[in-house]
């Protein structure tokens, strides 16, 4: 009888533990596969404003420091693509791969210590804000609106 009660108690604890895990997990954005995320990053890098061009004009700038191997960078790429489509005529969208030695001085200058790192510059190229990680689109939209005001 005692073994039966112990077995029931263990089963009940397991059910509650599993239910708690499933019900309390954060809802995530739709998954981006590694291949499609990398392809999107590559395409974005090819269509981004070159760093030298951005530093020579008077537009505000969003610099994304990324790495091809970074899965968070890959999952953020649809958000950055959508923002680029919406704001690209008024804001420079620059992408710098931290693994490319040519960007080492910019990585140091902007104190990048993780990816994705999004650095916002005003039209005089002063840093206004920096974000790291998977940033919600709504927050970035708000920041870009403020950057243009």
Positions of the model-derived regions?
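N-terminal targeting signals for export/organelle localization
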Residues: 1-42, 149
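A short beta-strand-turn-helix
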Residues: 42-59, 104
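Short active-site neighborhood of thiol/selenol oxidoreductases, capturing the structured segment around
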Residues: 56-68
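Hydrophobic beta-strand anchors of alpha/beta hydrolase catalytic cores
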Residues: 62-63, 93, 118
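C-type cytochrome heme c attachment motif
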Residues: 68-75, 116-117
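Typically the conserved alpha-helix immediately C-terminal to a functionally engaged Cys/Sec
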Residues: 72-87
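Thiol-based oxidoreductase modules, predominantly thioredoxin-like and allied folds used
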Residues: 89-104
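Non-catalytic, surface beta->alpha helical segment in thiol-disulfide oxidoreductase systems
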Residues: 114, 120-149
